[in-house]
Design a protein with these regions (language model features):
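Catalytic cores of nucleotide-sugar-dependent glycosyltransferases that transfer UDP/GDP/TDP-activated
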Residues: 1-231
Length: 231
């Protein structure tokens, strides 16, 4: 998801001769086609993803959190840069847009998963509408105050993929296996077409995966596991 978006975005900007710094959690690596970017990694306390919390959960940000450390590092590198591009769906980077005299741009990759984040997006968007972009219009519609969303679709490094010219199945589905991803819709389509569905991705919610399997005949879903792009 975000990892692929980041590598594609960095690769595309490098091809246009931009100077890029990337700030990421400790042990992160960039893909080979992003090797000319500067990678800065930071250690910190991880937090639970927003899609796994209640909609009304209030944010608790500690100074030791990975998000706090990353935004602090990014701000320390602004002397030689034009802007910060934030790819995290998190409260702190969005709040910072109003607190610092430096452009922070946000690529929002999720729908409305948190009331608190929705409210801060609304507050910041009112003053800086051009600082936000979304992946799809459907996703942006989760935020009714966004009147004319900037849409930035996911780019792909085409050279890393091999085109398969096949008119017959099986069908493929790629993504983390958890309820918000909607795998059941893909299985439904495959069953209506009489095709097997190959599923690539980390099975985060095993109970969810089992429930879907029980709804369809044996062999309808073929679990392929979690692979790197090159695989």
């Amino acid at each position: 998801g975000v990892e692929l978006t980041l590598n594609s975005l960095v690769s595309g900007l490098l091809k246009q001769n931009h100077f890029i710094n990337v700030v990421a959690p400790f042990n992160s690596k960039l893909s080979d086609n992003c090797s000319s970017a500067n990678l800065y990694t930071v250690k910190g306390e991880e937090q639970i993803s927003w899609q796994h919390q209640d909609y009304s959960t209030e944010t608790k940000i500690s100074e030791s959190s990975i998000v706090s450390k990353m935004i602090a590092k990014a701000l320390s590198l602004t002397k030689d840069c034009d802007a910060i591009i934030n790819l995290s769906y998190d409260l702190l980077p969005i709040c910072k847009t109003l607190e610092v005299d430096y452009p922070i741009l946000h690529l929002i990759s999720m729908g409305d998963e948190s009331l608190e984040i929705k409210n801060i997006i609304s507050k910041v968007y009112a003053k800086h509408p051009n600082n936000f972009a979304f992946h799809t219009r459907s996703q942006a519609s989760d935020y009714p105050f966004i009147k004319d969303p900037i849409i930035l679709g996911n780019g792909f490094e085409i050279s890393q993929y091999t085109f398969q010219e096949k008119k017959e199945g099986p069908l493929a589905w790629v993504g983390r296996v958890s309820p918000e991803k909607g795998l059941e819709d893909a299985v439904y389509v495959a069953s209506k077409l009489g095709e097997e569905l190959n599923v690539w991705g980390f099975i985060e919610d095993k109970k969810y995966a089992s429930r879907i399997e029980e709804l369809y005949p044996s062999g309808q879903i073929c679990w392929k596991g979690y692979l790197k792009t090159k695989e």
